[in-house]
Amino acid sequence: MRPPDDQINNNVGSNSHLEKLKEAMDHQLQKSSKIVGSFTNSQNSSVGSVHSPILESPTSLNRQHRNSFSFNNVSSPSLEDERLINFPRVNPNRLMTSKRPNELFKTSSMSSDCYSPQKSRESLNSLCHSPAPSVSSCGNALNNDNTSASHSLTDEQPFETDSSANLFKQLQEKRNRTIGNVYEMACLLVFKTGLMNFWKNIIDFFAQQFFSTQISVVEPRDLSDIYNTPWQLRCYYDGGSHYDPYSNPISVNDNLASSSYVTVVASDGSKGIIYKDPASLKHEGDLLIDSKVVQTVLERATLLVYTRKQQHIVKNTKVHDNDYFSSIPNVDDIRSIKNSWKVFHDEKLNELKKQVEISASAAQLNGLYPQKKRAFVSHFSQNRKPYSQSDISKAQSSSFSEEPSNIYDEYEQNLLSPWSRSPVASPSIQTDPNRNPFFQNCLQESSFATESSTEKSASESVSETAVNDDCKGMNFSGNRRQEDHLNDFTSFPTETAVSIVHVPLMFPCSDQTSSRGRAPIAILSFKSNLVPYPENLIASIERLIPFIFSSYSNSQSVPLLPCPTQRHLLFNTSSTDNTKELSMSASSENSDCPHKEGECVGSFCNINAKGSSLNNIPKLPRFVPVPSEFFKKNQRSWVTLKKHRLLARLKSRISKKNSKVNENLRFSLNDGENYSNETITLKKDEIVLDKSKSYACCTSESHKYVQGHCGGQAPPFPLLKVIIDSIPVHVFTADPGSGKLTWVNRKTLLYCGLNMNEQIELQFSRIHPDDLPNFLNDWKSSLFSGSGFYHEIRLQRFDNVYRYFICRAVPLRDCTGSVLHFFGTMTDVHDQKLAERELQKQSAIAANENSYRSLAEASPQIVFAANGKNGIIYANAQWLSYSGLSLESSLGLGFLSAVYHADRKKCLLPESLEGTFNNQDESNGTKTFAAEIRFRSTDGHYRWHLVKSVCVNNSADTSTNLWLGTCTDIHDHKMLEEKLQESNIEAQRIVRSKMQYLSNMSHEIRTPLIGITGMVSFLLETQMSAEQLSYARIIQQSAKSLLTVINDILDLSKVRAGMMKLTSQRFSVRAMMEDANETLGTLAFSKGIELNYTVDIDVPDIVFGDNMRMRQVALNVIGNAIKFTNVGEVFTRCSVEKIDYSTNTVVLKWECIDTGQGFNRDDQLQMFKPFSQVESSTLPRHGGSGLGLVISKELVELHNGSMSCQSRRGVGTRFMWTATFTMDKTPLKFEPPDGCCPVCFCPYEKSKQSTEDYYCADDGNDKSATNFVKLAVNKADPGRESNRRKLESDKNVQSNKYVNPFASESEFCRCGASADPYTVLFWRLYRNKPSGIKLDKSALAVVVSHTKYSSEAIGNMLQSIIDISSFKDIVRYGNTYEAFEELLENPMQSKVTHIILNLPDIEAYVLFVKSLQLCSLYKDTKFILVTSTRQKESLSKIFSDSEDCNSESIHYVLKLVKPSKFFPLFYSDSEEKGKIGALNDMTRKAAMEQKADAETLRYNLAKSGFSVLLAEDNIINIKVISRYLERIGVKFKVTMDGLQCVEEWKREKPNFYSLILMDLQMPVMDGYQACNEIRKYELENDYPKVPIVALSANALPHVVLSCKDSGFDSYLAKPITLQHLSLIISGILNYTNQSKLHK
């Protein structure tokens, strides 16, 4: 209904001002209609090919029906009208499931005006079919609207329910127009002002039209610097918080107003919030946008669409059928609708049911229901309860207090694939691979319908077109049919893909390329379940951006609360019907002046109310219009902005309260379609002109300043503070005395993200640490001198990013010149700094480009330059001449035509190949690229080239990195290399196969031989006949010989395979030589040849090296010499070839000389080849494998040495080899302990070592169950204990006190030194007396031998034991006849004290001794005869029976000759001969004391109840250790693994076991784990710590450290000795007794 036209005419005619105003409004409305028509014409492109009359130009539509185009359909801004009229509209399917069905048949009356859905449809039809109005018709329309506005529609107007067909038609028409168009959106955005209205409209638009489930608006804290200040959350909406507009209204108390946000209720009941004080981005629930995305939006300055894949942890719970029927319209709902209307026949009812089900399914697919808390939440639920205050609190806390819990990946979306247009789902994302997408039972038949069958109505919207046209086949949280969504409610995806859209709100501009120069004032972000997001929806949003920007900018000028004096919000219900309506009013701060009904409250005024005056009109904000340049065709503004400008002009003419108006004026402003009438009632005398009124919110002090500034007055302090805080420079003041900051402006605080107190406390700590020292020094100097300050620094931003600033400061002085304060500024010059660096870099590149180009052209190689973006950017003339390509065809990727097709992948830069060729140079950190590529030459052949390039500017953007490289022709070298590689591979295969075969053969043959030799040794201990004993010895000798050959083969295979590893241990060179010669002495003396050796005086006595391997070399070489020598002698000499004291190394040289038959030069070439021997017809066939010398040479080379030989046939052979060793810095000058070798101070072994024992050695990997094999293993791999011994020896050398826990009762050492009494005595005194034995200075010794090298060897040994300075001389004779004649015919005048004779037979000895004893000069001479055992027996009998000989002066030395054998003979003649008896007494006394200690220990152990727990899995070891424990009287218990040991220990009392002996390698639980369990149990139960000793055959240092870390108290290496066990047990017993005495 509209009021009569004459009513408005009378009112207007009474005032001339209003007539002018009406004319101006008519003029503006005429312009507006044209602008709207031009604007809506541009909307047709955004909806694709679908034609809808509502999207046509209003101008073209209105030409058909001019009289019907008016603004009488615009409703007032009441919440109820917005629910029914304003965009977005509620789906009628949702209205049908309301709790009160009778609401469908009535409409509520509003205080201002009302609206009926039927009239809305009529007005819509009239709009679509009415011509455009003229200027006069617009005026009439204005009058008619005013008349209509004055009419009160307070009665309920029910729908026409004459027939069910009409009702169904009405519902169908209402459903068709539930979605508006872009035109409606734009008009609604600019129609209402205020942030609450803005946010309500945004929620309505994006939640229902753009399928948004979550929306947020962020804005910068400082608009003057949006890049360097953090952004904050202003508005937020979560689709999970729903509000039912038909339920009871929300009752909010006053406490809600004191919160930090305001709740806004949208048309569909959804709630959004607006922060009064904008919050941090972390407050956002699902974090739609963060600081990194903000920076990306600022850089791109355009709308961005991302795809986010979220990982959800959702329990797969079965939804009950009742839940399903409660979430969608059930049969009862449909029956209630049928009973209410009573006119629907069965066919219509089924059709309605189908539409409702499809609507529910589509709503679920489109993401209208929230999926954050549960899978499906429906608006059709019938048992919904109204919200309470606690619900609001929970929703607020859950939405804004929790941290984002979902893990997601985010990337920018691509364009839609062609499958998105298909009527069926895309096969690329089918969940069921067996389903054929082209032959399905349920297709969307509507997609194939003709135009005659289905026609689109005139009210279809942009979003509806998008869903039908572009969203087919999209991922709506799973690509399934509608039946699947309705029937399967229990399938919850673990990964959900959503679309995130970021819309920057920027000042609109007609030129799209100028967006880089604009900055957004806010960023609107929303989330949608449409993946990918439709393009036409994006186009619609882009057209709405200017209106969203204008609305948001205008809303910033309006206070968030409706009234400036408002303290809190009240949600009241003011309605004249039964329908509840939410209205927001503001309560005044003054309780004495409450708002009356009809007064203007906030930005909403009830113009029809009585008593309205100018005082009730709020201050109108200034608006930011969209410039006319945005519209390219029509350069005009739109209606909405013109309306607000008119209101602003009108308000500027209203005086405060002075003038009176006699006549009420009523006017109406209408803008757009379907808008409410807004009427303002004024009094005539209150309309005056007041141009001094400003739109900005200024204080009275500001007005005073504006008025007084012209008179020269200074601006007030508040204005100065505002100015300082607004300038884009950091301002600070500092104390001139201390230099500390006293104040900073707001710009500084925003940049650093701190408050004033924090900034004052931190001072200059935000400066980069590298710049801070220089800054403080210059700052102190400036403070001291009172001069200006200038420094360039890097200042830390709120997000920990450093930016360059120029800091300037000047002193502020008073009239006397004293410095009161320092005033400083910091100017951001980061961009200038980066630009300066880039300019310098480009200048340097440009300066060197010509030089590089000249050098490249002069190079004979191919030179090129490339980058990742453009490919090849330069190639020199050499490439052009080689390939025949032109420069233009080679640039970019054109060079690939000359690259072999298989090598083209190699041309990718390193970053493209994920680091395949990306080699980082460690020296300078540059990236290099190298590849071998085949290029085609001009003759068509491909040649190999080595391509090398280097990255000269390694930047973060890899596409701009410059690579310079060269190509070198390596074709000939490549061909040769391939041939050599093929030959080498084949040779290695053959050698590897042979070595593998030999290794397998040796292992398979040697294993049974070990059993044969072991059993034969046991057999020899039994009673056998002479013939059986002979057979057994032959078997033993043959088995040992065969085992020697097999071991040699294995050693050779290990050396060739690189598996031979040397050990470093202390050993004596002299002792090693003695051992090797003594081992082979029996073989040499049985053949009647002499065997001797010498070690020079300057050879270090102790060196570090692999003793066993060097002994093996000596045995092989000396044994080979003995084998090929039948007459004469074999002599070995050791000397120093080179010594280096700086590195503490020495190179020793060995020479082995024999008097055999020798060999020629041809045989010398075959000497060091495997399985080769010297063959000659004159030589007999000798046994052997032919591997001894080969293995010896390999071992010598492992010691950094060499081996060679020289020979002359018929004369003899000389073998030479060298090896490098480390010298022992600290000589052993202390006496060795009992039971240890006096040479190397290592414990003795159990039995005397022989050559055969060594060759029984294994490779160190097998662990047999017998002591014999275990001993062989240790001998084969002596490195197991060498490192430990070396460490212990080093420690004892430093402390000069040695305690050897490994001392044993055996009589043999690894170093080869014998344990006979004379040897021990020699080495003991030799260590204490390294200078030698002192004799009479007139003494003279004579050596007579029948061979050349034997006399030299005996003389050398005498020199090693006698002090040369106290001895006159040693005379040597190598010829017995010459010596006999000279000694008898020409006797020596000096005193001859010793004559050493080494003669070939017994007769020579008898002749020499008897003849010399008859001479008076040799009366007191001592004769030393070097003989064999048989010769000694015969000579002893002859001299004892002879009366002419003095047998007491005759002494015997058995071969092999050693210094230790001569030592007792010379020592008894020295001045210290009395010490021998004392030494023997000390030895006997020590033995007696040791025996007494053993008895005492046995008695104490039996008395104390000492008990031992043994954990060992080897039966032989258990027997040995048990025997030891029984001998010393210790109680013990045996367990077979670690688990049994732990359980046995826990079973007894804490102190029951005094010691635990635990093996490291055991089944079930090893020693390490068992020890850890025991130590852990002791700590948990506060048990005393029990001693645990580890037992292992591996004594390497890392094993000892591992035992210590695991909790072991000590470590024992196998084999375990009785003495060692006694020492450990006695130490524990003594400690226990002392503890008891102490307590």
Swiss-Prot record:
Q: What Enzyme Commission number(s) does the record list for this chain?
A: 2.7.13.3
Q: Name one GO molecular function term.
A: phosphorelay sensor kinase activity
Q: What's the chief localization of this chain?
A: cytoplasm
Q: What is this protein called?
A: Peroxide stress-activated histidine kinase mak1
Localization, UniProt:
Cytoplasm
User: Where is the PAS domain positioned along the sequence?
Assistant: 716-786, 848-920
Organism of derivation? Schizosaccharomyces pombe (strain 972 / ATCC 24843)
Query: Region Disordered: which residues?
Result: 38-76
